Amino acid sequence: MADLAKIVEDLSALTVLEAAELSKLLEEKWGVSAAAAVAVAAPGGAGAAAPAAEEKDEFDVILTGDGGNKINVIKEVRAITGLGLGEAKALVEGAPKAVKEGASKAEAEELKKKLEAAGATVELK
């Protein structure tokens, strides 16, 4: 145990350049590459993030365009949001804009269907 403590002390005293040189020497001696270990570890981290994305339960309904049916889309936006005519018109003309934020998946899908039926292009985020 005393030998390990001495090694830790010696390694802690190394400068960055000395540590880099030590790393190269160990890679040559053991026939390994430190970069390969990092590359192998990266996919595991990405895989862990994927299930969290699948479990998303709140969505933003984003109006990306009026599809040439501005009047129908404005009417639908007013019905969904309760905005006045001028505010709904500004929202549609300012696309891409959020029509509804934090909606449940079912509500977001329903709003998307209604807006697309009016001629709008919509995406869920």
Swiss-Prot record:
Main function: Forms part of the ribosomal stalk which helps the ribosome interact with GTP-bound translation factors. Is thus essential for accurate translation.
GO biological process, one term: translation
NCBIfam families assigned: L12 (TIGR00855)
MF-aspect GO terms: mRNA binding; structural constituent of ribosome
Keywords: Ribonucleoprotein, Ribosomal protein
Keyword Ribosomal protein: yes
Listed GO CC annotations: cytosolic large ribosomal subunit
Name the UniProt record assigns to this protein: Large ribosomal subunit protein bL12
InterPro entries in the record: Ribosomal_bL12, Ribosomal_bL12_C, Ribosomal_bL12_C/ClpS-like, Ribosomal_bL12_oligo, Ribosomal_bL12_oligo_N_sf
Organism ancestry: Bacteria, Pseudomonadati, Pseudomonadota, Alphaproteobacteria, Sphingomonadales
Family according to the record: Belongs to the bacterial ribosomal protein bL12 family.
UniProt subunit comment: Homodimer. Part of the ribosomal stalk of the 50S ribosomal subunit. Forms a multimeric L10(L12)X complex, where L10 forms an elongated spine to which 2 to 4 L12 dimers bind in a sequential fashion. Binds GTP-bound translation factors.
